[in-house]
């Protein structure tokens, strides 16, 4: 592989690499917009773009099963959940000036520093490593399924228990207690919800 | 394909998510940033799994299996996380992380953003943390 | 039961009584009095039995070693010779009398249970000292007596006098006990044992290297315990305790422990001529000084206290002449009549409502109020003044005879100088003793002025005890001086003609001169009314006494003396009176020599502690405070800030780890 990698330079990219780079740029841009935009709903929508871009990257890496799972669960379920969350917390539609906390510059410093460190290390370690994408797909549904149900059955079943626990936990957490419900009833009598006014 | 491309993209996505976690005020936006970080890790896992499945004689496809697990756990996480954010929002009337400062010294439970029913809970919390 | 078992029971019974008294004192008040009296009485009976079995013959020795204790073995040893047997009887008799007397004297005292238990404990410790054949075990009893004395002197701890006196008694005796302990250890190191018999054997075989050093160190402890010059100052102040305590501890037993100790180890002291001379000088100074001071005191109990010091001086004088038979003989008779004097004084204080002789001399008919105390006290005072045929005469004459024996060079036991010192001082003291005894009697019972207050009859038990003690005061000397040599070393204790005539003569002179002086001065009494009287004369005797002691200083401006021109002592002593009243300024000397330097050192230490040490302490507290305040500013409660700091640190660490790993 190291010998083979010697013949692949960064200055002569293959088609897959070009496609990966372009989609990667789109994904990264969408991600940056997700964390910087001042409109909360837009952030959720840009997140959809970023996650979808990642699904494309998975496809380019021949991991097709992961890619479809990504589309199904992230784009389909998680983003919808987040949008519901935004709606239930009465997130304002439109630009909100205080979307970023005062911690922004510290966050930027830390993020840039860690990005520099990570990129430096990763590039330094893997600049000659080459992924052979020809041949049978590494992440086809058959391959993934076989490995999942041959080698990973026990963690898979344990994970189902975890998901069940998370399900129950989420229900318990979002249930209203009696006292809270009583409050809600009394608050319904007031002409306008205070929270909306405050927000 | 050079392994460096997905690896660098993953690192950059991770740091973007990191920035979001540290800089965003709304708890749901923070959760979204966490999703970004998780996805960056997933990309890393998939890329290295593809590379190793070619390089090694036998492989367990552990990278892809772990990616699937991560996705499942992320789904669970976002469910629980949103439930917590909703509960906090219901009790405090806000989901801004930098307003939840009960652990600080000299914390005033009667902040301007808290309404009447929230006061009792906040006071209880302040007592519990004190 | 064997003699050994009986002898072991003697100290054990009062100890058990004390423990039971302390445990049951609150829960079962009805048992306190029997628990106080009966064990002591039983111990007395057993002590008599032990003495009867021992019979003055060979000493009874019994040893058991509980456990090895290191280099020099400490053994539970009994060594009962004639001295021990007889002194134990004295201790038992006086302790029983005092316990009986206390049931009346502290009739209504709320602290009676602990008081009685402490007296029992004290009695037990004294028995231990008397019977013990091992010096370490003896020291245990010695120190228990010290601490009991501390508690009992401070029985009226509400009054500042009692508090100060108990502390003083404790500290001064401890001052002597430190060299005493060092001396004991040095002695044991040289001999290789704490056993008295072995030590005496080593002395007999002349194998001690430093007899003088050891003897002088031991003498310091003896001086502290037996109230000899210069460590006697605690005894007059200890009169702030209840009268029965004074009778038991400060007259008959504890102060006798030092004399008894020297008597036991006399061959050791005889091995050092210097120690004998020091002992003689100490005795002489003590005798004369205390007799002069006694003549100037106003508090009746302080007179008796100084007289105790003087009589103890006689005993140490006898020891200095190498005649322990005479010393212990005087110890026995003195124990009887001095206990009687104190107990009678307690009755008088109760009846008169005051402890001041000046106030008593202005009361008419006090003797008719307390006829029992009057007669018994007269007997005891005659014994004290050594008038034949009272017991004090025989014992004192035996002391003087021994001194004359040595002075005229008939013995090798002690240097002649010691003999002359003791003889001359003894005669002078005999004169002074008779003088202050007469003064006490005249002032207390021959008062003129207002009628003495009537507080009803004294408790029967108190009067009965007086008569019990009057018997030995009257007759012990005359009956015993022929028998005692069989129990002791065999020295003849019969009075010699020369010293008898001389001693009785000077005693008579002292008495007559004092009477004359009193006739001269008592007319002045009516002109200067004086008096300090207890606020509640109808209370029980202990309460009256406590109040009388507390009232003395406010009334007269001094604890010891009163500005009374009708006092014959004032006329007799002349310019010396002022100094004698305060014990020849010895307390002031101690204050200048020890108390002030110690206080100065203490204030220096306090200054250093406050200004130097505390600075560091405050800095050690303040620096973390500042750091904490700085760190606290970081605790904003904002989770994002925390995570930012955490991740920044992680990045730094990771980069550092990578740099180290790549060798950059």
Swiss-Prot record, chain B:
Record-annotated membrane-spanning stretches: 3-23, 28-48, 68-88
Region named Disordered: 97-130
Bias (Basic and acidic residues): 97-110
GO MF terms held by the record: NADH:ubiquinone reductase (non-electrogenic) activity; quinone binding
Compartment list: Cell membrane
Entry EC number(s): 7.1.1.-
Compositional bias of kind Low complexity: 114-123
Enzyme class, UniProt record, top EC level: translocase
Family per similarity comment: Belongs to the complex I subunit 4L family.
Function: NDH-1 shuttles electrons from NADH, via FMN and iron-sulfur (Fe-S) centers, to quinones in the respiratory chain. The immediate electron acceptor for the enzyme in this species is believed to be a menaquinone. Couples the redox reaction to proton translocation (for every two electrons transferred, four hydrogen ions are translocated across the cytoplasmic membrane), and thus conserves the redox energy in a proton gradient.
UniProt-recorded name of the protein: NADH-quinone oxidoreductase subunit K 1
